[in-house]
C-alpha cells in the first residue's frame, strides 16, 4: 500500500525510496496506489542507477494490466530497466505463496473487490505479520492470520456506520480473537472514527494487545 503522502512519511522516518525492495498492493483503489507513479518516477529520474537493489512490486491478478494502463498515460516516464524492476501477480481466487530470499509471502482473497488480497509475510526466523487490506468480514482472513504475531487490520468506520466491503472495530476484533493473533493493529480510519471509541468497540470481541495505528509508528515484531 502506498497512498497519498507515503513518500513524505517515508522520508520523515529517515528512509528513502531506495531503502524499499518490495511493495505489495492489496488492491488498486487510489487511496492505496496513488503514489505508485511518483515512486517509479522518482526512482528513474534523474538517475535510475541510484537504485542498487531491484524493486519488486506485486498485487492480485490485474496488477500487470493496471501498470500497463498507467504506462499508456505516462509512457517511458514510469518504465524502469528490467534489471531494476520485477513485477508479479498473486492469485486472487485462492491462496497463493511465494518464497523470497529472506521471507515468504502468502496471500488469500478477501471480500472487497475482484483483485483484493490479504498478505501474510513470514520472516526467515518464523515471525509473521498479516495485512488485511480493505475487506469485509472474511473467514479467509481468520485462516490466513492464525496465530500471527501482528494483524494489521483495516477499520474504516465505527460499528454503527458499517458499510459493505469494510470492517468496523468489533468485526476486526472478532477476526483477531478467532485467529488468536498476538497483537491487533487497527488502521485505515475514516474521519468518522474520530468521534467514536474505537478501542472500546474492538474490545467487544478482542482482549489481547491492541494498537491504534498512526503515521510514523514503528512496530517491532517478535520481541
Language model region names:
Residues 39-56, 111-117, 122-123, 164-185, ...:
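P-loop/Walker A phosphate-binding loop and immediately adjacent motor/lid segment at beta-alpha junctions
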Residues 10, 36-39, 67-70, 141, ...:
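Hydrophobic packing residues within well-ordered alpha-helices of enzyme cores
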Residues 4-56:
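Active-site metal-binding motif and surrounding structural segment of the metallo-beta-lactamase
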Residues 15-18, 53, 83, 101-103, ...:
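Structured loop/turn residues at beta-strand edges in well-structured enzyme cores
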Residues 136-223:
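Cap/insert and terminal regions of metallo-dependent hydrolase folds
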Residues 1-16, 86-143, 215-223:
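Core dinuclear metal-dependent hydrolase active-site scaffold
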